[in-house]
């Protein structure tokens, strides 16, 4: 890693932002270089935690981030075993990980972070140490990877664990705890800079049950009756459609901003149109409803 916790990292969407962030970096220090790399959008992030002995992998765990790559791994929601990875993606991750372990002659714990789009994978970084997801995957697998890694580093003979991550009949979710409500002027939007102040691990029969347990454990609450939907591209609207139908089926009152409201109506989903602050004189206003606590949950 170049930095810890994503400190001093920024994502630029245009040339103007790039110039501004480079100027900020120069103001801090003109003597040190700035690392610039391409930001891959809408990619899935994958964690590969493993223990190797003299370059041979003895045990491993592959987990997937629920959020797109670009959210710091300390803030991301992680599920293990992976539920939505292509078989070919898993095969490539295992192959590349074996090659890296062999090339670096790794003897102990290590973590590799990958990005995947379709079946193309890219290595974000390889850390020759245990990661924050090591304790989580160890508990889910019921294999103490740190104990195994310690014995390997001390030269104590060990046997290769026989348990396979695809043999598990349950799903684990690692969710992050945030303290935005207690921090004045905190920005609750997640990004490359780590913001979480803790985390929980939960097990369930499937992703949905484990995820619900984890969200409740970190202080989230189930919306009672009103949900505001506001999506961007046509692709995002299409991806949200089935979920919106499910919410309506369960009796939730749906509010939506302009384009989202039209899309829902065209697909037979009843909703109430709300307006942005820029649309003066029109009601109901989205921000007013939020300030008056008339909305229980926002999906944006």
Where are the regions that the model predicts?
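Glycine- and Gly-Pro-enriched alpha-helical subdomains that act as flexible
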Residues: 220, 224-226, 231-252
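A general structural motif
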Residues: 207-213, 231-235, 254-256, 275-285
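Short glycine/threonine-rich loop-to-helix capping motif typified by GTGT followed
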Residues: 116-128, 236-243, 266-267
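Short internal beta-strands
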Residues: 228, 251-264
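Receiver (REC) domain switch-region micro-motif
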Residues: 36, 227, 298
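Glycine-rich, anion-gripping cofactor-binding loops and their flanking helix/strand elements
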Residues: 266-300
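Short gly/pro/ser/thr-enriched loop/turn and capping motifs at secondary-structure boundaries
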Residues: 3-4, 67-69, 260-263, 279-282
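ATP-dependent carboxylate activation and anion-phosphoryl transfer catalytic cores
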Residues: 1-223
């Amino acid at each position: 890693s170049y930095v810890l916790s994503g400190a001093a990292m920024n994502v630029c969407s245009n040339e103007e932002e790039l110039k501004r962030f480079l100027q900020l970096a120069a103001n801090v220090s003109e003597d040190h270089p700035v690392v610039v790399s391409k930001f891959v959008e809408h990619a899935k992030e994958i964690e590969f935690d493993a223990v190797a002995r003299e370059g041979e992998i003895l045990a491993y765990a592959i987990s997937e981030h629920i959020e797109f790559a670009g959210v710091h791994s300390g803030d991301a929601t992680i599920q293990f075993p992976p539920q939505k990875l292509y078989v070919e993606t898993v095969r490539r991750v295992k192959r590349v990980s074996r090659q890296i372990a062999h090339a670096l002659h790794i003897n102990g714990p290590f973590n590799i972070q990958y990005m995947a789009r379709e079946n193309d994978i890219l290595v974000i970084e390889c850390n020759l140490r245990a990661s924050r997801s090591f304790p989580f995957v160890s508990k889910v697998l019921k294999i103490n990877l740190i104990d195994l890694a310690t014995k390997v580093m001390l030269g104590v003979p060990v046997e290769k664990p026989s348990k396979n991550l695809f043999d598990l009949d349950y799903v684990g979710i690692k969710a992050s705890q945030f303290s935005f409500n207690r921090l004045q002027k905190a920005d609750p939007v997640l990004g490359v800079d780590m913001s979480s102040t803790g985390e929980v691990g939960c097990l369930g029969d499937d992703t949905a049950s484990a995820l619900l347990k984890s969200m409740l454990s970190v202080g989230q609450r189930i919306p009672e009756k009103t949900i505001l939907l506001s999506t961007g591209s046509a692709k995002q609207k299409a991806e949200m459609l089935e979920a919106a139908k499910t919410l309506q089926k369960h009796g939730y009152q749906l509010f939506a901003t302009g384009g989202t409201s039209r899309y829902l109506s065209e697909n037979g989903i009843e909703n109430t149109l709300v307006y942005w602050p820029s649309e003066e004189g029109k009601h109901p206003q989205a921000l007013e409803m939020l300030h008056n606590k008339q909305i229980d949950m926002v999906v944006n």
